[in-house]
Amino acid sequence: MIDIKFLRENPDIVKENIKKKFQNHKLHLVDEVIDFDSKKRAVNLKGDELRSKRNSLSSEIGNLMRNGKKDDAEAIKAEVQQINSELAENEKLETEYAEEIKSRMMKIPNIIADSVPIGEDDSKNVEIQKYGDPIVPEYEIPYHADIMESLCGLDLDAARRVAGNGFYYLVGDIARLHSAVLSYARDFMINKGFTYCIPPYMIRSDVVDGVMSFEEMDAMMYKIEGEDLYLIGTSEHSMIGKFKGQLLKKSEMPYTMTSYSPCFRKEKGAHGIEERGVYRIHQFEKQEMIVVCEPEESWDWYDKMWSYTVELFRSMDIPVRTLECCSGDLADLKAKSCDVEAWSPRQQKYFEVGSCSNLTDAQARRLGIRIKVEKGNYYAHTLNNTVVAPPRMLIALLENNYNEDGSVTIPEVLRPYMGGTEKLVPKK
């Protein structure tokens, strides 16, 4: 959510930003906010005048009573009661206008960074840099589900019987490899100075409203029937939610946290769920990182955060590239976002394995996350980034370390988490 003062003073900039995001259907919201804001300010002024008049009359009543002029005092009391009625009606209007403003402000996208390329969808995202040479093997690499099944590590049929499409059983060495990746990622981030956290896996609706747009919520979140609770789609939501309504000490900034959690997603929309495989599913595990920081530090943190993901993948010899997300591919709260993509030797192309975003103060405004200083308080900036998200990461790992004999070499950094195992061999 943007600053209403900024919108009030710069409506043309806000409208131009909406156009850059190809959301012209939202242009009317700016004028409507200005209209309701004007009405609310007039009502606020009237309320101040009524309260001032009431205070003056109340003092006069006291003087009249002390001087024995009870009848005159009673007449003024009647006038005060009339003012109270007007104030009640006025306050009702204040609340109504505030709700009208908020409902519209929540739909207006955050101001994107000047460096964001303009484009309607992810086909217009711009490559920033490649890291590592893409592997082009002379032998055929099987589909990732086939590799996992050859290692007796995946059972999709059983998962389908138990839960339907979009779920899986990981078994044996593949399950161990999955855990090894997450354990390595956890230690990697702790060594970067981040505080490890295991957060709640459900959040209330007011936190959902604070961390994402309605469109994102509808496409992603599972609601618990009969409860004001939603299953998290990423631990970023509950980690950022930890700071909801908090007044943070400037001396304790920044807050840098990393967490492991299961994630649950509807995956509604154009992509949907894979019929067979583990690339896009309803339930998966992820190591996430978030930063809550001073506004002037957020862009430095943004560059650090995506570089950590690149470093993690390169430590396992997986080639990656970074992409600058274009304006139309940014969710409404994001000012700038960078995707990290891993190389797929089987498909001979890159695929998304993580995303880093700077939301500037948009999320903090929704959640009321402020920094305390001597002269007033101000909103913090929030950022989030995927450290690693198995099983997508497993797809990249298995394909890039697949050998012609069907075995898979374990990257050296993961071997301590696999009991020293160097290679996974197909089961006969």
Stretches with model-predicted labels:
Residues 27, 130-428:
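TRNA-recognition modules of translation machinery and tRNA-sensing kinases, especially anticodon-binding
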Residues 1-134, 149, 153:
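N-terminal alpha-helical targeting/anchoring segments
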